[in-house]
Amino acid sequence: MSITAQSVYRDTGNFFRNQFMTILLVSLLCAFITVVLGHVFSPSDAQLAQLNDGVPVSGSSGLFDLVQNMSPEQQQILLQASAASTFSELIGNAILAGGVILIIQLVSAGQRVSALRAIGASAPILPKLFILIFLTTLLVQIGIMLVVVPGIIMAILLALAPVMLVQDKMGIFASMRSSMRLTWANMRLVAPAVLSWLLAKTLLLLFASSFAALTPEIGAVLANTLSNLISAILLIYLFRLYMLIRQ
């Protein structure tokens, strides 16, 4: 059967509209979890204020030089802040991926679904999803640090891995390998969607500072919710595409 991107886009749009409130609640809940975890594990305001003490920002040619000019205590605070942000985002992304995919599965099975039920049903697979998303993020970030393009290619090739892990109950590395093979064979259908997702996330990041006009906490939740909705649309598209490819 010939698969066209247009038909998958249409199916994605219809599903997103029909389940919008449930997906919105999952996105909002994941955003709230991300912000709360980030706040809990981040250094205190007094510690963060120490990062500016005695660091010659104007004389630093880059981030590496800036870190080198910090004291050991400041470097530890920066590491803690970075780790807290990364950990909270990974947790939020894992819950989002599990929740959205379970929404699709439950709706496809003709069952009633709510945000809490979807997240609860995804609980058994969250540890594997967390590790998968961590490894995927790590590979993409390494690729972006090298020449940018390898990171984008990795993001495309590994896009189907979460769907395969949940839908087919694959292992972490098996889903990554299968995603690479299947995506490579269907690059014309996967690449435009992933590139659009990356572009949308980048644009949101550029305007994220404007959300802080409310309060930092509310702005962070709002920005994360919009980011989660963008990711949810991509997950719906990839799930629908994967099911069509398997037929």
UniProtKB/Swiss-Prot annotation:
The chain crosses the membrane at residues 20-40, 90-110, 118-140, 152-172, 187-209, 225-245. The keyword Transmembrane applies. It comes from Shigella flexneri. It is a multi-pass membrane protein. It is found in: Cell inner membrane. Residues 41-89, 141-151, 210-224 are periplasmic. Pfam families: UPF0259 (PF06790). This is UPF0259 membrane protein YciC. GO terms for cellular component: plasma membrane.
